[in-house]
């Protein structure tokens, strides 16, 4: 495996199956990477919400890579959005991409995360893989497509980015910002809207 332009050795130390993933079990691996200076191996992944330090292989355009369950890609897979699952009724690759953008609050789809670890987010989709929380629902935040947000009612962390900031950075979103124009009801009819989320509204 290559990292930072260097070849590093990866050791699969353990294997376990997560049977709680929507759509069926997913095999996870405990991955160890070599520290050449110390000639020792250390865990490649940070702990996820369940304290597990696990990962799994993920096919990308550049080849096979490993992703951790603590990262956005891994979290989205464990929510049931499997990019390798070629289904006629659900665009899984696009749904996984939308989920990664949503998880990071990457509104413009250009790998500029605007979230904060530990932020409570309610995630659901138009296909019923994930369903919205019906108890004390949070305010609607945004609708998401494969290339980022399609509309934003409020930003997740106002300290990181505001609606005005999004309007300046992403002209394509200017007419789709604010709770008056960005509603779940309206976006349910948008063909490119795959994923939706709610989060607590924060003041700048």
Where in this protein do the model-derived segments appear?
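Long, compositionally biased low-complexity segments
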Residues: 3-204
